[in-house]
Amino acid sequence: MGGILRLTLIPCLYINGDGGMSYQRVLLKLSGEALMGDLGYGIDPAVVGTIAQEIKDVLQAGVQLAIVVGGGNIFRGVKASAAGMDRATADYIGMIATVMNAMTLQDALEQMDIPTRVLTAIAMQEVAEPYIRRRAIRHLEKGRVVIFGAGSGNPFFTTDTTAALRAAEIDAEVVFKATKVDGVYDSDPKTNPNARRFTTLTYSHVLAEDLKVMDSTAIALCKDNNIPIMIFDLGVPGNIVRAIKGEAVGTLVGENCEVS
């Protein structure tokens, strides 16, 4: 192949004809696991620095960016619940873990002179602003990165669902789910070498086939509000900007997409 990387454009996504950005307001969902890199637990400062640089590139392109960050690199409520902990208590601990990640990312961004605000669904005024929808939108309009912490503030809801909820609330045009995989497959590619990777999917197909994109509540929220979802590998440098330009860097789920 001569080492040539061939990028194609996704047919069901609007592409800016002048090569500019296809979206102006984006909700980026970062999994907690993405922040720990190759570590088994916690936060890898080098990975966080790389993510911050990508976010800076997005901001410099004039795109408004809000972020929902998970907490699975520190604590997973579902696993703790399965081990016997009260589910609501476990979920609240997980929400606190997301705030730790949000503050870490905020620090990395501010060291690059990127104005950033952390808004949390659980009040902790000493370290973050409370989540108020109008305030979040105003921060975005002023060119600040907005990081949402503490999930939705309610147990039994995932941070994926929070991402869909916040995207609808702030009128984001798309949800980017940045993970450690390069898209959505019909089976686990780690165990099935013949697993098929999808380029585009419909919400209905994702729900009917129970594909592991986001949880069903998040998918339904995006479907009801016609918010497309892009799933891509955060580990590939430049993928966030490429996704905003409409390049096929992963799997796109949308109302007008075909299963391909």
From Swiss-Prot:
Q: How is its activity regulated?
A: Allosterically activated by GTP. Inhibited by UTP.
Which Pfam families does this chain map to? Answer: AA_kinase
Q: In which pathway does it act?
A: Pyrimidine metabolism; CTP biosynthesis via de novo pathway; UDP from UMP (UMPK route): step 1/1
Q: Where is this region: Involved in allosteric activation by GTP?
A: 37-42
Q: Does the keyword Chaperone apply?
A: no
Q: Which reaction is this enzyme known to catalyze? A: UMP + ATP = UDP + ADP
Q: What are the entry keywords? A: Allosteric enzyme, ATP-binding, Cytoplasm, Kinase, Nucleotide-binding, Pyrimidine biosynthesis, Transferase
User: Cellular component GO terms, alphabetically?
Assistant: cytoplasm
Gene Ontology molecular function: any one: UMP kinase activity
Give the first-level EC class, as a single word: transferase
Keyword match ATP-binding: yes
Q: Where in the cell is it found?
A: Cytoplasm
Any single GO BP term: UDP biosynthetic process
Where UMP is bound, by residue? 71, 91, 152-159
User: In the Enzyme Commission scheme, what number(s) does this protein have?
Assistant: 2.7.4.22
> Which residues hold ATP?
29-32, 72, 76, 179, 185, 188
Q: Which PANTHER family match?
A: URIDYLATE KINASE, URIDYLATE KINASE PUMPKIN, CHLOROPLASTIC
Q: Subunit composition?
A: Homohexamer.
Which family is it part of?
Belongs to the UMP kinase family.
What does it do? Catalyzes the reversible phosphorylation of UMP to UDP.
- Its protein name is Uridylate kinase
